[in-house]
Amino acid sequence: MLELSVSNPGKKGSKLVTQIPAAEFVLESFGNARTLFNSNASRFGKYTELQFTERGRLCGVKTLDYYLERNRVSAPPSGERNFHIFYYLVAGASVEERQHLHLTEKTSFRYLGQRSGNPRQNGRDDDGLRFEHLKHALKNAGFSKRHVAQTCQLVAAILHLGNLEFTIDRHRNEDAAVVRNTEVLTLVAEFLGVTSSALEIALSYKTKLLKKELCTVFLDPDGATDNRDDLAKTLYSLLFAWLNEHINQRLCRDDFVTFIGLFDLPGPQNMTSRANSLDQFCINFANERLQNFIQKSLFENQLPEYTAEGIAYHIPRVQYFDNSECLRLLQHRPGGLIHIMDDQARRSPKKTDHTMVEAFAKRWNSHSSFKLGNPDRSGFPTFTVNHYSGPVTYSSEGFIERNIDALSPDFVSLLRGNPDSSSGENSGSINPFIKGLFSAKAIAVQAHPRDEDTIVAAQQPVKPMRAPSTRRKNTIKRIPTLGDIDEKEREDEDANAPPSTGGTPCIAGEFRSALDTLFETLGETQPWYVFCINPNDSQLPNQLEGRSVKGQVRSVGLAEVTKRYVHTFPVGMTHREFVDRYREPLADLGISEGSNQERVEQTRAAMGLSDHDVVLGQYKVRLRPLYTAVAVSDIFDRHSFRTRPSRGLRTSSVPATPRNKSGTGCEMLRQRLVSRHVAQTHTPPTRRPAWRLNQVQRTHIDRTFPSRPSNFLW
């Protein structure tokens, strides 16, 4: 992306030079963490759109976030770190910032581990340096000094919030827990813009709606601790969503013509230090969807066109591992695992984690990708899904509760308040930044049926705030809600009764719906893939673990992909397009008579290529880029074409667009790169044939984009 922005001329281009890398570093600092296998692992799915003008200039960027691993905030896996930003702030804050944020050297934070106050020196130095880089990145990405200060204060508030301890006050008649370290409570309340007493009440009590009546639940120390962690996770996820949306407001353009989309997911998850939960299930489901999309794109999508062209016999069938059955197990409607768990969650508390697994087994016990397991140490049933990357065993503990993802209405009332309230008591946080994070756009709430000023339910949407761009120009399709989808579907055969909550959105179903829209967009583009292989599991340089690499290569099917692409024809054009593109060299060969198809046949014979290298279909001619580059160069040599001073090989290209699904620009870019490789490895230094083919291809681009900038290099 940096190379694309550097090559972009003008004032807007000079801004993008700093804005795009800055925005990437900001999201990386707040969304990445050090894991056992990666020192900078992304903990959220990211879809980035590079937006281009009609002249092929990069003009904007839009980023969508998918499923941030918010549980890491309060409970990082054993041996792994929390999100980078916490360590950056603790290690890199200035003396004044430390004093204001109460980040003393002796302070240790529960959310960073027991030794957070004294990290190893090298890591601390690196974190401190990166904090300085982060502040510069925030500035370049369009954040004001006030926003930077408020962001750092909220991150510090989350760290201090994790240090709150609860106990039972025997001198009071109530059974609710109280905060033991009141000085930390006062500090957190000050940072959040509320009173310490109001914050303590929100943490020690929980309001629930039972049969249209509000009930107050007294929380013991363990319950208050869980409530504290829920608030910390909510604050961090809202902050992350706000950061991303603020960047989009600065960099996203509505008047772009085409785009290049980059989709990146955390790799398949299989925890060793703790049980796999709904978070790992959703990430593995997304990877399963992506793997299936890649498989269909590489092995299946072009076959109907080849058959219609009458050239399917040139493409031998390659046997590959098809994960469609596993995907059907996960997302089939009705009756897939996601559909069942959503239905069970909506009928809570009548349905539990145990009944959910029972419904799984009743529907899928004989499926090859599903296996019912033994109860875990806590007595909760387990089940195993045989993903494409390998079997993963999930504990059902907390699945229903996490899938509902209910946000305590007390937190919303405390921090957002109610601006329509007649009394001034429920005004919310006096910190406008905190209050803004809990806006109606970020938090969906449900009011009491008899009192609109009383919030009885709240939820943070799992979908990104924006939708991916679609094929229609100048329109943004909103992501359909799960309720819209479920209205058109039959209930699961195990779910005869209607959901008790009237179709409350659930995490798994909403995430599936968001992925549906994303892959609909990806299906309208020309896809390219990058397979990431980890050389070893110890993050050591110059080390290659053969068994680990072999397993990764097998799981993504690289051998099958290679076999398939040996016989593919990525370069395709109609007979007329072929004749028009190579009209000048064909005339030099004396090929000027006959139909377009006959001219292609004459060219193939003159170049000495077989029908396997240049395949004539009923409507199109298919070319192999390597053979094409070598053959055309040989033609130029044999017929002594007039040479000119070499102008160098320019890699001008246009991005593949939804309207130009064939991705002509991308195909020519690949031809250009292959031509350069061939010229460097196969052509003696005295030969200079490359400029002629380059001229023909540049002319083709100029006909499509007349105003192509002369310095648009890729």
Regions found by a protein language model. Give the residues of each.
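Alpha-helical coiled-coil scaffolding segments
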Residues: 195, 200-206, 334, 537-538, ...
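Long, non-coiled-coil amphipathic alpha-helical linker/lever segments
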Residues: 130-132, 189-235, 619
